[in-house]
């Protein structure tokens, strides 16, 4: 009986995942994640925010006051809202009132009927060199944790003695366990490289990727795609999410969502492909207008005559296992088949996979070529992206054979 129950649960999870993937087709915009970054003054909150989400996310004076005690940082091109607690000095009587107000604000949001309006995770920052986890600060953490929002303690500025930092983390874990808060995750972070006098090389930044990964595991599924797009630490997470987007389009194509399938080149003005390209670009913080995407599609492409190279092996293209399995219906034929032998929906699915992967490969190369400031120049982005896509299409045509 227990095995049957487990199987039922697995099937239910798979159905929910399928619905989530299919919703990617219809959704217009990425969901915006709300992250509370709390901690006393001097713990490096702004440095942490900028390191994870971009250099200008928490620029001085750019925060919008939500309440007397909370500033909100947002950027129209980045699907994240950061709530930053301001001016906390835990020894003052005034701050104790601030703590109550902050808790009330988060609790109010958490009970909202709009799941996108809630606080989705809390990062509580503690300077690793303070060796202090008691009194008003511990009370504050206990109050915030009691709300039930996913909670992570971030030990910041971890450039000191490794053994001492580890001992401090263990002390925090022990206290948390005694107080029934052992579900709180702890991540050690050095947000920026640090150079000490007499040392030949700086201590490199570390821990940001772990913070992103731990946060993703705790976030509700409906908000994860927005957080992945917003963060700039883990390119592998961005690519994984893009592969899920492509997968949802491949599956939809196999079900017949394309009324008319081009025989040779999909890079024509097609609303569905434009929408997919826009979503893939957003995952890499490359926000492209419909006009820009149309220009990319019209100026990218190769004459493949009657040889549809999108039928080359998914293994050669580096497709994910999930997409490979979806496209593997002609496994016995090894994909060396004529266009006329492939049904319309299957042809559409393979074309979507091919051009989707070509696009994300090109975006990743674009990131390597351009600086952060150059990536804000839309004309430059479009021009360079067209060059990269055409180069990759020619390379892949050669791989498929004329």
Map each language-model feature to its residues.
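Canonical P-loop GTPase G-domain recognition
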Residues: 16-18, 159-224
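Short glycine-rich substrate-engagement loop in P-loop NTPases that contacts/grips substrate
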Residues: 63-65, 95-102
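Helical mechanochemical/support elements of P-loop NTPase systems and associated helical scaffolds
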Residues: 98, 115, 204-207, 351
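Conserved protein kinase catalytic core
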Residues: 56, 90-91, 130-133, 162-163, ...
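Conserved G1/Walker A P-loop phosphate-binding module
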Residues: 2-92, 287, 291, 346, ...
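Alpha-helical membrane association modules
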Residues: 209-212, 221-402
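Conserved C-terminal guanine-recognition region of P-loop GTPase G domains, centered on the G4
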Residues: 77, 100-184
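Short loop/turn segments at strand-loop or loop-helix junctions that form parts
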Residues: 83-88, 125-127, 155-157, 187-193
């Amino acid at each position: 009986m227990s095995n049957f129950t487990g199987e039922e649960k697995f099937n239910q999870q798979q159905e929910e995942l399928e619905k989530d993937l299919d919703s990617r087709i219809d959704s217009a915009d990425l969901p915006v994640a709300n992250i509370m970054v709390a901690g006393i003054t001097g713990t490096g909150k702004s440095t942490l925010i900028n390191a994870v989400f971009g250099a200008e996310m928490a620029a001085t004076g750019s925060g919008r006051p939500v309440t007397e005690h909370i500033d909100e940082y947002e950027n129209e091109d980045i699907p994240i809202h950061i709530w930053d607690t301001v001016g906390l000095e835990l020894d003052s009587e005034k701050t104790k009132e601030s703590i109550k107000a902050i808790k009330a604000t988060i609790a109010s949001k958490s009970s909202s009927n709009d799941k996108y309006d809630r606080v989705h995770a809390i990062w509580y920052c503690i300077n690793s060199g303070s060796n202090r986890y008691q009194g008003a600060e511990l009370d504050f953490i206990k109050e915030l944790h009691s709300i039930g929002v996913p909670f992570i303690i971030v030990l910041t500025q971890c450039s000191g003695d490794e053994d001492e930092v580890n001992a401090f983390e263990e002390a925090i874990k022990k206290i948390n366990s005694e107080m029934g808060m052992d579900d709180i995750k702890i991540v050690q972070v050095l947000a920026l490289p640090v150079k000490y006098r007499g040392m030949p090389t700086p201590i490199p930044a570390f821990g940001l990727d772990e913070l992103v990964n731990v946060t993703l595991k705790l976030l509700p599924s409906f908000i994860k795609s927005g957080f992945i797009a917003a963060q700039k630490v883990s390119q592998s997470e961005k690519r994984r999410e893009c592969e899920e987007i492509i997968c949802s389009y491949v599956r939809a194509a196999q079900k017949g969502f394309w009324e008319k399938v081009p025989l040779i080149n999909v890079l024509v003005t097609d609303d569905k492909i434009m929408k997919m390209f826009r979503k893939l670009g957003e995952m890499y913080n490359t926000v492209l207008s419909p006009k820009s995407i149309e220009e990319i599609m019209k100026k990218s492409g190769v004459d493949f005559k009657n040889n549809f190279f999108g039928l080359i092996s998914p293994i050669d293209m580096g497709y994910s296992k999930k997409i490979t399995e979806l496209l593997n219906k002609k496994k016995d034929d090894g994909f060396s088949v004529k266009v006329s032998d492939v049904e319309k929906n299957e042809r559409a699915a393979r074309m979507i996979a091919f051009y989707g992967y070509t696009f994300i490969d090109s975006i990743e190369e674009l990131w390597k070529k351009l600086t952060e400031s150059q990536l804000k120049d839309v004309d430059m982005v479009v021009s360079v992206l067209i060059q990269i896509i055409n180069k990759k299409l020619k390379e892949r045509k050669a791989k498929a054979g004329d």
